[in-house]
Amino acid sequence: MLQNQRACQLVRSKTGCEPLALAVAWGARTAGRCAAGVLGAVKHQRFSDQQLETFAARAPGICPKPVCDAGEPCPLPPQDDAVDVSVIVPVHNGERFLRACLDSILHQNTTRRLQVLAVEDGSTDGSGAILAEYARQEGVTVLHPEQGGSAARARNTGLARAVGRWVLFVDCDDCLLPDAVETLLAAQARTGADIVQGGWQYCDEADIRGAVQQYAEACYTGPRRLDVVELPGTPWGKLYRRTLFERVRFPSGYTCFEDAMIHFWVFPRAKCIASTKPVVYLWRKNTMGLTATSQNTAKALQAYWVAEEMLDGAVRLGLPQDALFACNLILQLANYCYVCVAGLPEADRQTAFACCCLLYRRWAAKLPDPRTLPYAVRLAQRALEQADYGLWQLQGRLFQLIN
C-alpha cells in the first residue's frame, strides 16, 4: 500500500502533508515501474546453466555457510501472568549508548509489568559493569550465554528466559520512545493482532534525529495479507505474541542477516499482523554495526546462506508454501541479496546471483503461479527464472520505487 512506500514516508516526514506524500509515492511508483519496463527490456545479461554452476561453486570459498545449533530448540518457559512484556536486549560492546537504551525501557509511561532481559554477549568494553549496576534494579535480569558470538544467540538466550505474554526486542544502541509499550499494546487490543509493527525514526551517533518511518493503520489479513512484505524484517520495533517463538529461534551461527527469520518463520505463524502509525522506536545508524560493516565484506554472502537456512526451517515447521512464502523467498533471493552484496567485487556479486538462481529453480515448481504475485515480486521472479543478471541488478536498485 502507498502509505508504506519509502517515498511516501520520506515526504510525510519532511512536510507532514499526507496527501502530498501519497501523490509523490504514486508518481514515484509509476515512474519506477515505467523505468523497470523500459530498462528491463534492454538490460539483459543472462547466464547459461554452466555459468550458474561455475559461479555458485565459488561460494563456500568466499564465505563458508555458517553452522547453527543442531536439533529442536528448548521449549519456552511457562508464561507468568504477572508479566506483561518481556524486553530482550542483546548487548555487545554497547557502553556508549547502553544507559540510554536501558533507561528508555525502564522509564516507560506504563503501569504494565516489564521483564527486562539484558544478554551480555562477550563485551570487551565497559558494558558488563553498566549491566551489573542495572541488575540491581527490580525487573532487570542480566544473562551470560555459555556460547555467544552473535546477536542471534543473544536473542535466543533471552527467549529461553522470557515469561511475558508479549515480547519486544531492543538493540543496545537504540531506544524506545516513552509511550512505546502502551502504543503497541493499545494497537494490539484494537486489532487482536499477534504482531504489531510501530513506526520508527533514524537517530545518529550524536543523538540527532532524522527521517521518520511510519506505517499505515492496518491489519494484514485477507486481500492485504501479501502487503505484510512491505514491513521491515527487523526484530525491533514490533510487539510479538511470545508463543510465536515456540519451536522457532534465530539462526544462531549467523553474525548478520539472521533477522530473515522474522518474515520467513514468525510472520507466517501469526493469524493477524497489524501496523500502527505512531513512532515507538529510535534506530541508531551505527556505522560500526554488524550489518553496516558486513555489506562490503565476504560476510555479505550470509544473505544468501540464510535463505537456505530459512527454507530448511520452513519445512521443519510445516509452514505452507503459499503466496506469502513465495514472496518472501523471491524477495530474499533478489532484492535483499542484491542490496547486501552490491558492495562486493563483481565476481562475488555474480557468485551470489548464481546461488540465488539455482536455489530458486529447486523450489520453483512448489510455488504458486507467479502471475498472482505483486508486480515487484514478479519482476524479481523473472530475473531469477531467466538467470538474468542485468535484470537482477535493476530490480534491486529500483525496488523501493516499484514496490
Residue ranges and their predicted role:
Residues 167:
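Short aromatic/hydrophobic "clamp" motif used to bind/position activated sugar donors
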Residues 280-286, 293-321, 333-366:
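Catalytic core of nucleotide-sugar-dependent glycosyltransferases
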Residues 104, 120-129, 147:
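A conserved acidic beta->alpha catalytic loop
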Residues 2-69, 123, 343-403:
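Membrane-interface aromatic/basic loop that binds lipid-linked glycans or pyrophosphate carriers
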Residues 89, 113-122, 141-145, 172:
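Short beta-strand/loop segment that forms part of the nucleotide-sugar
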Residues 93-107:
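Short, well-formed alpha-helical segments that are part of the catalytic scaffolds
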Residues 145-162:
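Glycine-rich, basic loop-to-helix element that forms the pyrophosphate-binding segment
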Residues 172-274, 283-298:
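Donor-binding/catalytic cores of nucleotide-activated saccharide
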